[in-house]
Amino acid sequence: MNKKILETLEFDKVKALFEPHLLTEQGLEQLRQLAPTAKADKIKQAFAEMKEMQALFVEQPHFTILSTKEIAGVCKRLEMGADLNIEEFLLLKRVLLASRELQSFYANLENVSLEELALWFEKLHDFPQLQGNLQAFNDAGFIENFASEELARIRRKIHDSESQVRDVLQDLLKQKAQMLTEGIVASRNGRQVLPVKNTYRNKIAGVVHDISASGNTVYIEPREVVKLSEEIASLRADERYEMLRILQEISERVRPHATEIANDAWIIGHLDLIRAKVRFIQERQAVVPQLSENQEIQLLHVCHPLVKNAVANDVHFGQDLTAIVITGPNTGGKTIMLKTLGLTQVMAQSGLPILADRGSRVGIFEEIFADIGDEQSIEQSLSTFSSHMTNIVDILGKVNQHSLLLLDELGAGTDPQEGAALAMAILEDLRLRQIKTMATTHYPELKAYGIETAFVQNASMEFDTATLRPTYRFMQGVPGRSNAFEIAKRLGLSEVIVGDASQQIDQDNDVNRIIEQLEEQTLESRKRLDNIREVEQENLKMNRALKKLYNELNREKETELNKAREQAAEIVDMALSESDQILKNLHSKSQLKPHEIIEAKAKLKKLAPEKVDLSKNKVLQKAKKKRAPKVGDDIVVLSYGQRGTLTSQLKDGRWEAQVGLIKMTLEEKEFDLVQAQQEKPVKKKQVNVVKRTSGRGPQARLDLRGKRYEEAMNELDIFIDQALLNNMAQVDIIHGIGTGVIREGVTKYLQRNKHVKSFGYAPQNAGGSGATIVTFKG
């Protein structure tokens, strides 16, 4: 796009509005190079980047980027084979640090969907080795001792020698105090010296480095430290040489990565520029517009970014509309409206946000041309007309259907009749060539052209006749009208004179009355539209607040869930530990009493997570209150899910119950009544138990074939408990022959169980030594 339009619209001043939000010199350089483009894909990419950055700020409102300096020259020096100095290495170090922080930020970013920005974040390089090398340079511009072993050795020797010098000088200060003008160690020519009285200069052997202006003090480096000082000077030279060697070595290590580091710096600057755009959006309530590829423009509440307290206006430049002609008197804001349209298009095509409301749409133009003169004096010279006409002639030779044309005070500066005719002819030529044009004029003849000509629309700037001031409101579809009579009357001109004047142009008055009615209708429509916008803004604010609250609640929910998971994991770990201890205690006892089995099972039940707190279930509490328990009622013991029967009630209100072979004492809250019509078998853990009936009474069978030893012993333990609680007299245990390990385990278990009356292998026709029949005590 031509540079002249950017100068006319003061685009550089607009770009300067974004500078305070930038953090890097790379971002600043990219902003300065920013220019409008007609490539739709690039504009869409810039718009998408801004929208994604806005979404990122919702989740990370304090997102920032480490400030960095320009390193393009540094990288070029590396590529040319030059070695870098400490200051240049610090610039590279800063860029690598900024890159690492951005990569870390992106890796930990959640709840944001990124596509365009993700491409930039993922292109950043990781240089852990180089970052380690560059740690040799601290921020004060000093090479650290750990940069090399040789440097550390040299500096240790320097430190030791300097300590010796200080010790010697301190001793001499004490010994020769009466010979010194001051009790301090001075420095001259980089050497440590004593301020000796001139009368004692021959009493202290050494090298004279200076004499005071009065001649009373001689600065002597004592002979005792001369050799040490020379040694220090030599070590300092070695130190400088070693530092140069380190700079050369690290330069060689960085050199192969110069291009990658330069690319990283550019990406950091690009992300910084996108961030600055969004900060501008937040500060100025700007928006990312929609993009129309058919030159349709719809600007809602658009403002000129450089005008303080600018009035917001709507501009609708539809696809079929060729020209908008703004008529009316000068000083009403016509030129500002013209510039606002042009500048908004330039900003959007440069990938910048615009000062307008949501729903605004911009077109794409290959070129924008303008003939805008800031001089709006009524008396314009012929030379001014010639200058403008020369410019217009040049523009007419360059514009095409892909151009936007802005013409200010078209035809001004010459005879009004001729000027109006020229203006209409130029507009007609542009209309026939289908070139989108916005033009301003104060010629009344162009009002009729706008009304009578297809694809051309009149517009004007509102004028408040009550205050005699322009309101700067853009009234599209309403031609401008003269307010001369109204203004003259309000300024005190005789009504007779005003009436006489109005009678001379009755026909024009009819037109003015029509225009006045149109203005009133437009104002009424604008008021309704403003009310609608206020409601939309309130809804938008509420929507943002609800979205923010929703995100916060989700984060809190996730935090609480994570805490709950951690607590649950701790509880499970504790439960497993306690259950292991209970099982160890059980297995360590050779004889178990019935109540110990029940207590152990109850403990294990309590370790299981409870899905429902039955004691707080109001429905169950009401159901229990319908009928009080009585002796003989069937119950379910809540602590471990076993069935039993109430046998008696104690004086303290507790109940005795028979649960299998065991008598238990229970509080009423520890059991539930089982209704006869609702009795169902209580679900227990499945352990391959198959009940059968025979003439010998109730029996059960446990099949342990194919089980691992620990699994088999665990199932056997549960099976025997259930058999005892269900008053079974006899059970069968099928363990197979195999290696005999499980069979031996079953035998040992049965031997130490005091409830087992007897056990032995089954008959040959019932499994032989592969099965064991167990009989319990009555």
UniProtKB/Swiss-Prot annotation:
<keyword id="KW-0694">RNA-binding</keyword>
<keyword id="KW-0540">Nuclease</keyword>
<keyword id="KW-0255">Endonuclease</keyword>
<keyword id="KW-0378">Hydrolase</keyword>
<keyword id="KW-0547">Nucleotide-binding</keyword>
<dbReference type="InterPro" id="IPR005747">
    <property type="entry name" value="MutS2"/>
</dbReference>
<dbReference type="InterPro" id="IPR000432">
    <property type="entry name" value="DNA_mismatch_repair_MutS_C"/>
</dbReference>
<keyword id="KW-0699">rRNA-binding</keyword>
<dbReference type="InterPro" id="IPR007696">
    <property type="entry name" value="DNA_mismatch_repair_MutS_core"/>
</dbReference>
<dbReference type="InterPro" id="IPR046893">
    <property type="entry name" value="MSSS"/>
</dbReference>
<dbReference type="Pfam" id="PF01713">
    <property type="entry name" value="Smr"/>
</dbReference>
<dbReference type="GO" id="GO:0004519">
    <property type="term" value="F:endonuclease activity"/>
</dbReference>
<comment type="subunit">
    <text>Homodimer. Binds to stalled ribosomes, contacting rRNA.</text>
</comment>
<dbReference type="GO" id="GO:0019843">
    <property type="term" value="F:rRNA binding"/>
</dbReference>
<dbReference type="GO" id="GO:0005524">
    <property type="term" value="F:ATP binding"/>
</dbReference>
<dbReference type="GO" id="GO:0072344">
    <property type="term" value="P:rescue of stalled ribosome"/>
</dbReference>
<comment type="similarity">
    <text>Belongs to the DNA mismatch repair MutS family. MutS2 subfamily.</text>
</comment>
<dbReference type="Pfam" id="PF00488">
    <property type="entry name" value="MutS_V"/>
</dbReference>
<dbReference type="InterPro" id="IPR036187">
    <property type="entry name" value="DNA_mismatch_repair_MutS_sf"/>
</dbReference>
<dbReference type="InterPro" id="IPR036063">
    <property type="entry name" value="Smr_dom_sf"/>
</dbReference>
<protein>
    <recommendedName>
        <fullName>Endonuclease MutS2</fullName>
        <ecNumber>3.1.-.-</ecNumber>
        <ecNumber>3.6.4.-</ecNumber>
    </recommendedName>
</protein>
<dbReference type="InterPro" id="IPR045076">
    <property type="entry name" value="MutS"/>
</dbReference>
<dbReference type="Pfam" id="PF20297">
    <property type="entry name" value="MSSS"/>
</dbReference>
<feature type="binding site">
    <location>
        <begin position="328"/>
        <end position="335"/>
    </location>
    <ligand>
        <name>ATP</name>
    </ligand>
</feature>
<dbReference type="GO" id="GO:0016887">
    <property type="term" value="F:ATP hydrolysis activity"/>
</dbReference>
<dbReference type="GO" id="GO:0030983">
    <property type="term" value="F:mismatched DNA binding"/>
</dbReference>
<dbReference type="InterPro" id="IPR027417">
    <property type="entry name" value="P-loop_NTPase"/>
</dbReference>
<keyword id="KW-0067">ATP-binding</keyword>
<feature type="domain" description="Smr">
    <location>
        <begin position="702"/>
        <end position="777"/>
    </location>
</feature>
<dbReference type="InterPro" id="IPR002625">
    <property type="entry name" value="Smr_dom"/>
</dbReference>
<keyword id="KW-0238">DNA-binding</keyword>
<dbReference type="GO" id="GO:0140664">
    <property type="term" value="F:ATP-dependent DNA damage sensor activity"/>
</dbReference>
<comment type="function">
    <text>Acts as a ribosome collision sensor, splitting the ribosome into its 2 subunits. Detects stalled/collided 70S ribosomes which it binds and splits by an ATP-hydrolysis driven conformational change. Acts upstream of the ribosome quality control system (RQC), a ribosome-associated complex that mediates the extraction of incompletely synthesized nascent chains from stalled ribosomes and their subsequent degradation. Probably generates substrates for RQC.</text>
</comment>
<dbReference type="GO" id="GO:0043023">
    <property type="term" value="F:ribosomal large subunit binding"/>
</dbReference>
<dbReference type="GO" id="GO:0045910">
    <property type="term" value="P:negative regulation of DNA recombination"/>
</dbReference>
<comment type="function">
    <text>Endonuclease that is involved in the suppression of homologous recombination and thus may have a key role in the control of bacterial genetic diversity.</text>
</comment>
<dbReference type="GO" id="GO:0006298">
    <property type="term" value="P:mismatch repair"/>
</dbReference>
